[in-house]
C-alpha cells in the first residue's frame, strides 16, 4: 500500500471487450476505479475529467485497451472529526512516464 505521494500505473482494459458492446466504456471507468482502490486502499477515488473523456473518446463501444494513469494519494481530515479519509485522484499520464513512483 503506497503512502501519500504520486504513482504511475498502466491499467489493462482488455477485459472490458468480453462484455456487452454498449456497456464497455462504463465498465472501463468502473475497472479503473476498482484498480486504483485495490492498489492504493483508498476510501474515495476521484477520476479526472480528462481521463474520463479519453476513455469515452472512441464511443461507448470501443474504449482503449490500456490506459496509463497518475494516481495522487492524500489523507484528509473530515470537517466533523472522526477518521481520516484516504483519497486518490486519478488523471491521465503522458507517454514518457514509467510505471512506479512519480517524482514531479
UniProtKB/Swiss-Prot annotation:
The protein's GO terms of the molecular function aspect are: structural constituent of ribosome
Q: Which Pfam families match?
A: Ribosomal_L31e
Offer a single GO CC term for the protein: cytosolic large ribosomal subunit
Q: Which UniProt keywords apply?
A: Ribonucleoprotein, Ribosomal protein
Q: Which InterPro entries match?
A: Ribosomal_eL31, Ribosomal_eL31_CS, Ribosomal_eL31_dom_sf
For whether the record's keyword set contains Ribosomal protein, the answer is yes
Q: Is Repressor among the key words of this record?
A: no
Q: Name one GO biological process term.
A: cytoplasmic translation
Family assignment? Belongs to the eukaryotic ribosomal protein eL31 family.
Instruction: Return the protein name.
Output: Large ribosomal subunit protein eL31
Q: Which organism is it from?
A: Aeropyrum pernix (strain ATCC 700893 / DSM 11879 / JCM 9820 / NBRC 100138 / K1)
Q: What is the lineage of its organism?
A: Archaea, Thermoproteota, Thermoprotei, Desulfurococcales, Desulfurococcaceae
Amino acid at each position: 500500500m503506497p503512502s501519500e505521494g504520486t504513482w504511475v500505473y498502466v491499467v489493462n482494459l482488455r477485459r472490458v471487450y468480453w462484455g456487452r458492446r454498449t456497456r464497455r466504456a462504463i465498465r472501463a471507468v468502473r475497472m479503473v476505479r476498482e484498480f486504483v482502490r485495490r492498489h492504493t486502499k483508498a476510501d474515495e477515488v476521484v477520476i479526472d475529467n480528462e481521463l474520463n473523456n479519453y476513455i469515452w473518446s472512441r464511443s461507448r463501444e470501443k474504449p482503449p485497451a490500456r490506459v496509463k494513469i497518475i494516481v495522487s494519494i492524500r489523507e484528509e481530515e473530515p470537517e466533523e472529526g472522526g477518521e481520516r479519509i484516504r483519497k486518490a485522484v486519478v488523471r491521465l499520464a503522458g507517454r514518457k512516464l514509467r510505471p512506479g513512483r512519480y517524482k514531479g
